[in-house]
C-alpha cells in the first residue's frame, strides 16, 4: 500500500515525516526501512521512538534503533522501565544484555511490572537483582490493590511484608473488591482491623458485600 501511494506521488516527508513516525509507532519495520530509503528522517526523535517501541513490544524496531546508534540507556534507562511496566519481557531481556540498569529510579521497573501483574517480567527482574521490597513494599501493596493474586503470592514468597505501610495491601484489596487477595493476606498475617477497621469500612463504602461479610466473620466491626 505504501509503495502504491508513493507511486501516485505521495510525499513521504509531509507533515513533518508523519508517515515514518506512524510506522515506528506501530512496529512496521519494513515500512520504516522503505521510507528511510526514500529520504524520511526522524533521527532527531530516535530516543523518543525507542521508548515507544519498548513500551509497545516491538523488539525488531528496538534492535533496529540501537543498530542505528540510539543509546539503549537514554533517559535514565527509561526504555527498560517502560518495557517492564508493560510486560515486554523479550525487550527487557535484550536491554539488560546491553547494560540497562534494572534498579534505577528506586527499582521502578519491578514496581511497575508488579503493579500491572506481569509476573514473568518480575521473576526475571528479581533474578537479575531487583528489590521487590523497594519503596516500602510498593510491589506487594499495589499488586494487592489491583487484584493480582499470583503476583501477591510470589512476592510474599520472596519476603514481601503483607503489613507494610499500616496494612495498605489489605485495605486497598478490600476497597477494590479483591476477595481472593484479601483472604490470602489474612492467611499470611495481615491485620484486617488496622487503622480502626479501615478495610471493612472501605469494602462497605464501595459495595463489596462478600468482603464485608468475610471480614465481619473474622471479627471486623462494620460501623454502617
UniProtKB/Swiss-Prot annotation:
| Pfam families the record matches | Ank_2
Signal peptide region? none
Mapped ANK repeat ranges:
1-14, 15-44, 46-74, 75-104, 105-134, 136-164, 165-194, 196-224
Keyword terms: ANK repeat, Repeat
Indicate yes or no for the key word Amino-acid biosynthesis.
Answer: no
Q: Which pairs are disulfide-linked?
A: none
Matches recorded under InterPro entries: Ankyrin_rpt, Ankyrin_rpt-contain_sf
Supply the name of the protein: Putative ankyrin repeat protein R845
* Organism name: Acanthamoeba polyphaga mimivirus (APMV)
